[in-house]
Design a protein with these regions (language model features):
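Extended, histidine- and acidic-residue-enriched regions that form the cofactor-binding/catalytic faces
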Residues: 1-106, 110-235
Length: 235
């Protein structure tokens, strides 16, 4: 169920519902994938999990599409907010969700800029919400090899997920893009704070030409498994 598509009486009649909140960013994802890739993935996870869960009833909140976006700021289309703004929005929305009678709030994020992740971890803890932390080792090890290597921004991993849910948004140029292996965690540890200095002059790394909708669907199943497991453990 999508909250924005329900009527007020329909929400009032829900029994012990939980809320899922997709979070992402507006930032470049190569010359081939949409700016809203991270948000699209988070929405896909939440909607699949909500459909799979019968009890408790799960409601998907409208996505928070803006995030802390500095790495891609030199490219057209990047629109970001500060850590303070993100933290404040999470606290406000979480308080409102609680006031509306939702039992728990689950935050689902697929924008992994370190400041975004750190802010969401802190805000979720402050708000009493649950944050599905996909970059924690126990979760990351369940995902694809490209994701585990950290060379996955708009690469095979993310492009496959977009192909699974919105293939019309992936430019056919993806098929001709050369692989660009960049160890993003190592680059971050070395103090590089933007795509250009990391060696991503077209705002992507990994191998988008190897992406497929089939892989995307399989990855969505794994991502959804993790979210459903968290809900069942904590709701």
């Amino acid at each position: 169920m999508r909250l924005a598509e329900l009527t007020s009486p329909q929400v009032e009649n829900l029994v012990n519902p939980i809320a899922m909140w997709p979070v992402g960013a507006v930032e470049p994802h190569g010359p081939h994938a949409p700016l809203g890739t991270d948000t699209l993935i988070s929405v896909g996870m939440c909607e699949r999990a909500a459909a799979r869960l019968g009890d408790p009833p799960a409601v998907v909140l409208p996505a928070l599409a803006f995030g802390v976006t500095r790495y891609g700021a030199a490219f057209a289309g990047a629109i970001g907010i500060t850590e303070a703004t993100l933290h404040a929005v999470v606290l406000d929305v979480a308080a409102s969700v609680q006031q509306q009678g939702f039992r728990r709030l689950f935050i689902v994020n697929n924008h992994f800029e370190p400041e975004q992740v750190a802010t969401l971890r802190a805000a979720a803890a402050d708000a009493g919400a649950l944050y599905l932390d996909l970059v924690r080792r126990r979760n990351a090890q369940r995902l694809t090899d490209e994701f585990r290597r950290g060379s996955c921004h708009a690469g095979r991993y993310e492009t496959s997920l977009v192909l699974a849910d919105a293939p019309q948004l992936v430019d056919s140029a993806a098929a001709d893009l050369p692989a660009n292996e960049v160890d993003m965690p190592a680059a971050m540890a070395a103090g590089r704070t933007d795509f250009l200095t990391m060696g991503m002059d077209r705002a992507y790394c990994g191998a988008p030409a190897e992406a497929s909708a089939e892989e995307g669907r399989a990855t969505f199943e794994t991502l959804t498994d993790m979210l459903v497991e968290l809900v069942r453990a904590e709701a």
